[in-house]
Amino acid sequence: MDSSTAHSPVFLVFPPEITASEYESTELSATTFSTQSPLQKLFARKMKILGTIQILFGIMTFSFGVIFLFTLLKPYPRFPFIFLSGYPFWGSVLFINSGAFLIAVKRKTTETLIILSRIMNFLSALGAIAGIILLTFGFILDQNYICGYSHQNSQCKAVTVLFLGILITLMTFSIIELFISLPFSILGCHSEDCDCEQCC
């Protein structure tokens, strides 16, 4: 009989009050403790939705920039300030990219994607802050933009309301974008599948 087929007996010694039958059907269970805060868990669950919102806001911001492109008509000698700053274009690029990275991180969580997503959301938050500041200057500088050059008072008020409505909508998009991208750039891990100590 060679040593590979030899069986060595195992003896279990239990105290009198414990019997082996109690432990035969025991199931092992593990308790995990999450290091994520409730806010992190909420954002991790809603990542695809928030990423989609960022992309939609980026597309809408770009669309308003295209609308401003057609405002250089007589009698207006210049573009609105917000168009001259370029915010509808570079802001929309930041919003679309940060939203795309959030969706990518939710689909496949890798350390590189998490880092890139945090960087893009940080840049998007900075872009949203810059956009809020530029839009505030736009309200101040261009509040009489339409009526200051047009002599036809009937069209002046209606177009001014439309122009200010677009600026208010852009301001709303920028504020919401700031509230979406800032937590993702600060809180660290985005996904429930991610080991936070590894990527934070």
UniProtKB/Swiss-Prot annotation:
Q: Classify the protein's membrane topology as the record does.
A: Multi-pass membrane protein
Extracellular compartment: which residues? Answer: 74-80, 142-159
Matching entries from InterPro entries are given as: CD20-like, MS4A
**Gene Ontology BP annotations:** cell surface receptor signaling pathway
Q: Where in the cell is it found?
A: Membrane
Q: Name one Pfam family in it.
A: CD20
What gene codes for this chain? Answer: MS4A5
What is the protein's known function?
A: May be involved in signal transduction as a component of a multimeric receptor complex.
Question: What is the scientific name of the source organism?
Answer: Homo sapiens
* TM annotation in the entry: 53-73, 81-101, 121-141, 160-180
Q: Which residues lie on this side of the membrane: Cytoplasmic?
A: 1-52, 102-120, 181-200
Supply the alphabetized keyword list.
Membrane, Receptor, Transmembrane, Transmembrane helix
Spell out the protein name for this chain: Membrane-spanning 4-domains subfamily A member 5
